[in-house]
Amino acid sequence: MPLLHRKPFVRQKPPADLRPDEEVFYCKVTNEIFRHYDDFFERTILCNSLVWSCAVTGRPGLTYQEALESEKKARQNLQSFPEPLIIPVLYLTSLTHRSRLHEICDDIFAYVKDRYFVEETVEVIRNNGARLQCRILEVLPPSHQNGFANGHVNSVDGETIIISDSDDSETQSCSFQNGKKKDAIDPLLFKYKVQPTKKELHESAIVKATQISRRKHLFSRDKLKLFLKQHCEPQDGVIKIKASSLSTYKIAEQDFSYFFPDDPPTFIFSPANRRRGRPPKRIHISQEDNVANKQTLASYRSKATKERDKLLKQEEMKSLAFEKAKLKREKADALEAKKKEKEDKEKKREELKKIVEEERLKKKEEKERLKVEREKEREKLREEKRKYVEYLKQWSKPREDMECDDLKELPEPTPVKTRLPPEIFGDALMVLEFLNAFGELFDLQDEFPDGVTLEVLEEALVGNDSEGPLCELLFFFLTAIFQAIAEEEEEVAKEQLTDADTKDLTEALDEDADPTKSALSAVASLAAAWPQLHQGCSLKSLDLDSCTLSEILRLHILASGADVTSANAKYRYQKRGGFDATDDACMELRLSNPSLVKKLSSTSVYDLTPGEKMKILHALCGKLLTLVSTRDFIEDYVDILRQAKQEFRELKAEQHRKEREEAAARIRKRKEEKLKEQEQKMKEKQEKLKEDEQRNSTADISIGEEEREDFDTSIESKDTEQKELDQDMVTEDEDDPGSHKRGRRGKRGQNGFKEFTRQEQINCVTREPLTADEEEALKQEHQRKEKELLEKIQSAIACTNIFPLGRDRMYRRYWIFPSIPGLFIEEDYSGLTEDMLLPRPSSFQNNVQSQDPQVSTKTGEPLMSESTSNIDQGPRDHSVQLPKPVHKPNRWCFYSSCEQLDQLIEALNSRGHRESALKETLLQEKSRICAQLARFSEEKFHFSDKPQPDSKPTYSRGRSSNAYDPSQMCAEKQLELRLRDFLLDIEDRIYQGTLGAIKVTDRHIWRSALESGRYELLSEENKENGIIKTVNEDVEEMEIDEQTKVIVKDRLLGIKTETPSTVSTNASTPQSVSSVVHYLAMALFQIEQGIERRFLKAPLDASDSGRSYKTVLDRWRESLLSSASLSQVFLHLSTLDRSVIWSKSILNARCKICRKKGDAENMVLCDGCDRGHHTYCVRPKLKTVPEGDWFCPECRPKQRSRRLSSRQRPSLESDEDVEDSMGGEDDEVDGDEEEGQSEEEEYEVEQDEDDSQEEEEVSLPKRGRPQVRLPVKTRGKLSSSFSSRGQQQEPGRYPSRSQQSTPKTTVSSKTGRSLRKINSAPPTETKSLRIASRSTRHSHGPLQADVFVELLSPRRKRRGRKSANNTPENSPNFPNFRVIATKSSEQSRSVNIASKLSLQESESKRRCRKRQSPEPSPVTLGRRSSGRQGGVHELSAFEQLVVELVRHDDSWPFLKLVSKIQVPDYYDIIKKPIALNIIREKVNKCEYKLASEFIDDIELMFSNCFEYNPRNTSEAKAGTRLQAFFHIQAQKLGLHVTPSNVDQVSTPPAAKKSRI
């Protein structure tokens, strides 16, 4: 181990508490570790300093590394030292007496170099000059030397062998030494007996000393000195062998003659350092002489005699004289020696001066050199440290995530596995988020009261039920779009500019300059015109239900972009952000997916794949997002978001300010405590001064008082400064919120917040410190406000823009959604390449490691650099191949627990660009995400692979239990069964109403074939007025279907080169489907052919006379026969249904005189005008039903010239229609009601003068569209729903969209009336419904005939036309249900039996029922029924009444609830506010169980008006007029309105939440 400052160096041991994973600094040179860099740095500097010396050679001025190397070399040299020489050399060393090691080394080397010892290996030069390596066996002395023979040592006196170092007999020693020197044997005289070391040479030989030599460098002066340093040490100034070496080699027991046959040498004696400068030998001799003299004198004294004393004195005198002479000689010699010695000393001194000067210069140079080296070392360390700091700085910089070398493995998320295909799960979430954000704007709760969940959306996309949630979703989208477009058209009409201005604006927008946009708009306009040409109304006016939905959706997609015209250019530019045709999402769908639109023309939307359904929903969402109302909605929420963020920032700033104030208050309190302590000390000092003053004189007292005054003033000044400081802080606190409040004045919703913070600021300054409970309450209040603002911000973000939380290293997006809980991961590889997903090494790290390899070992972990320029440039220089894109499907995953979230946050890298931002966001939103994960259900998003019994969500809408299960058959089959039912139903109503008959040989066979699905039995030819007309004729284009391409020019070319082929189908339709569609379309065509022309009205009211142009009816027929899907046939059926004048049916006959439908047995029909007349109402009365033709007084032949023309007839007919649509089912009234009826007749006579067209519009079965302008959500809703036989309708369930249900036929045993009085769905059509459902017919096997019943009043009877020969003219009736037609004798018997059972009871109770006042019967009002009552939909009586009230000119005060902002005291006076929109919503939701509840709400509305508004105000006057109108309309419906109804009103439900 090297010596530090010539002392042993001890290494620093590792700390005892060192952890295995702790990062330390390692010093390689000393093999030590340090926790702190400063200690490591000091040890490195120390190791590089020249303060070390070699422990073996003793060489000083070395670094630690140099000392180690010196020790290593020295030990290697010692290993090569000849072993046979070790003991002889140590023995010889014990004979020396020297104070310096090099002197001993010179003596021993001079003696040993020419002598060779036993067992030593030497080289022998043979006679031929060759060198032979041999081992010495024996040393032979010269032959003349006595005492030695043959190398054996004789026994000699020990004094001659061992040199004694004692001073007992110096004279003998000196003489002996002198003798030995003289007798020393020349070493060249010795001979040596040697033996070769090679095995083949075994003979020994005797050689001379001149023939022997040692190998070169085997024994040298340096090796000997190095060896002696290891075994010697100074003792009392003399170099002696170490005791350990003496004991190890047993030197005291050795005999020199064993090694060499000669006397031991006598070496020169060198005095110890402590006696240097004195002649020790002379002193030693004089002392011996004195001893001898003393002994001589003592002997002489013992023999003293006088004589001998005298002789002795003489001899003494001689000896003294001789001594004096001797002393003189010695003195002379001494003087000469001293002189010589002085000269020698002078020479030595000069030499020493030179040596010292040289040493001084050397040391100075060495010092300068060491200084320069140390400076270089320091500079080197500083540079290393600077590089290290720069390295850390570069390593800590953010970088590309895949360049980080310390990436941890992310926790594996669970893949989403639902019923939906993985590729459309993201789009499903988009639709769900859209409905969640904008559902309130478009009244989503009308279609989905419980909201849309992921399970409902899955069922809509995966299922094929035509009555399922997909139908509801599409109905919601289409009605919302139609309503919004209608509202925008009204606004455009109001704000329309002149033609010139519009033209200028169009040119400015440069819309017409693009031929592609113009062509697309033209094609869309053609598609938009198709419904008007072939169905007689616009697309928005078509009947929208589950059956026609597919075709109307297709037509809407084709017509997208048609509303982009030059007339609304300004409106689009100002309100819709410059919207043009290419911005329409449906047009983009038509251009990008022409096959989907083509498939929709022949396939039902319910049978599309989930991906195709999702594309349609995606396009409809995009369409809604471009609307003005949606844009305004988003802008409102942007303002709300901005305001909420501002309030949140102010709340945070307020919290920070309070924290600063509290900290300042604590500091102020500490300062006050210090001042109090100082005051206390000053008081104590003053007390001491007072005591001193009492002892001292008066002068001293005055001085003490002055000092005390000085102290008092200093304290007072400090107090005043403190008070001023406090006042300044108070004024700042008071000024700050005031100025802040002034800066934000006028911001609504923030005044309360500002007042609250200002009050808190004042309280903080003025009141005492808050207690712990108050502080906790204040903290909770702040947390509550913060939570409310965060929720407000999140809800606003959901309605404006949803961003992902961030992305990780693999570019995966992380999402949280307001609509569904959980943390979702989207793996979207679009736009990525394979090299982007692989780890990338950094060139910076490589460069730094190559320049300084020690840096990496000093850091605790591998470092990473930022630069990637070299890597990026490398492939460009050496490779032309481009990176490959990633082809992986889009995949969604999720984390389901907070533990996985914590693992994710821990694994994200804080140095990556993407992951650092994601980690920060996750930490901020952790509480919100954990709250969502607590509500997360993993089973919904990851189905197990095991088959589940039935995981589909139950989406029942009130279907009958015995109806067919739609999940067991495709939607096409469902629609086919439904269409057959509708065709049979409309044919039966036309036939029973004597409006016509199908032109076939046997009607029963035709119906049986249609009902059983044997379409081949239907006629393949169509007869029109007896002329055979083939099915395929020249037809017009119904479907605008172009073969589009991706490029716009190709799209345009495809549009221009298209040739119209058929009306509505394409060649790719499967033959099986097309045959069914063809047969059913042909059946509908036959039904239309059988209707008499005079019973058709617009749009299919064209006559059969020859015309030069095609009418709507002609185009309708052509389109029908070219239908490619069942939905298209349904659409044509709807148009036909609303074109039939159902009021002319005998099923709806009403007495022209008394305007009542009752007593059908005593009613006859006029053969001229087809109006009904009671036999007892005609003047004169008819006692019997006349035979043959009968004409009313106005139509008698003699007055035929006075009959109204066909153009005027609808005015009278429509008068009946108004009553049909407004009237109830029961006309039983007492005398008071008959008086009211006469007033009603007078009112209707006045109304007869109005335009007939307007009244016809009310009776059209088009769900009130477009003539009755309702909100879109009421379209297609029937007023009542019926319970099927054997099943009670569940409350809260919605009736089936196309279910055919019937009223119960149970007859009350007490009253003989039906248990439930049913309002007919459309009053203009028959009230007959099928009793047996389709599934019942199929399950019973044999084909059964249908039994029809009609909902009638007890006195309603009529006679049948003579053409209806299969119906008994006087068939008995149920009290409320009458059999219309039967098909077999079995049915006739069963119906007749049932009729006879109730005939007597009905007849006996008829009169008493007539005298009784009608009680309101409970009715079941459906919100909207998708089932067709005869194939059409109409408003219920209540809905129509509400619509009439809304359309009235005096309804303006009652349309909506009074605004509390505009009229603050209204709700203080009116406790039960209500308006027409509330009543209409309750009607739509079927909340009215009794008619009296409906009347009570209406009367409550009027009473509120009269209670708040004085009678002379315009609101009260409007209320009076509207109330009178309501009473008249209610009496028409048979509703008994009395003022007492107002008192019976129950508390109305809460008003509908207003739309933003």
Curated annotation (Swiss-Prot):
Cross-link Glycyl lysine isopeptide (Lys-Gly) (interchain with G-Cter in SUMO2): residue positions: 952
Residues with PTM Phosphothreonine: 731, 1547
Keyword Cytoplasm: no
Subcellular localization(s) per the UniProt record: Nucleus
Pfam families: Bromodomain (PF00439), DDT (PF02791), PHD (PF00628), WAC_Acf1_DNA_bd (PF10537), WHIM1 (PF15612), WSD (PF15613)
Compositionally biased region (Polar residues): 842-872, 951-965, 1277-1312, 1363-1374
Residue ranges of domain DDT in the record: 422-487
Feature: compositional bias, Basic residues: 1262-1276
GO cellular component: ACF complex; CHRAC; nuclear chromosome; nucleus; pericentric heterochromatin
Domain spans labelled Bromo: 1430-1533
SMART domains: BROMO (SM00297), DDT (SM00571), PHD (SM00249)
Keyword Ubl conjugation: yes
GO biological process annotation, one example: regulation of DNA-templated transcription
Listed GO MF terms: DNA binding; zinc ion binding
Domain named WAC: residues: 22-128
Tissue specificity statement from the Swiss-Prot or TrEMBL entry: Highly expressed in testis and at low or undetectable levels in other tissues analyzed.
Bias (Basic and acidic residues) ranges: 662-695, 715-726
Phosphoserine carried by residues: 270, 702, 960-961, 1281, 1320, 1339, 1353, 1363, 1371, 1402, 1413, 1417
InterPro entries named among the record's database cross-references: Acf1_Bromo, BAZ1A, Bromodomain, Bromodomain-like_sf, Bromodomain_CS, DDT_dom, WHIM1_dom, WHIM2_dom
Bias type Acidic residues, positions: 703-713, 727-736, 1213-1258
UniProt-annotated stretches for the region Required for interaction with NCOR1: 1-133
Role of this protein: Regulatory subunit of the ATP-dependent ACF-1 and ACF-5 ISWI chromatin remodeling complexes, which form ordered nucleosome arrays on chromatin and slide edge- and center-positioned histone octamers away from their original location on the DNA template to facilitate access to DNA during DNA-templated processes such as DNA replication, transcription, and repair. Both complexes regulate the spacing of nucleosomes along the chromatin and have the ability to slide mononucleosomes to the center of a DNA template in an ATP-dependent manner.
Family designation: Belongs to the WAL family.
Protein name: Bromodomain adjacent to zinc finger domain protein 1A
Native species: Homo sapiens (Human)
Gene symbol of the encoding locus: BAZ1A
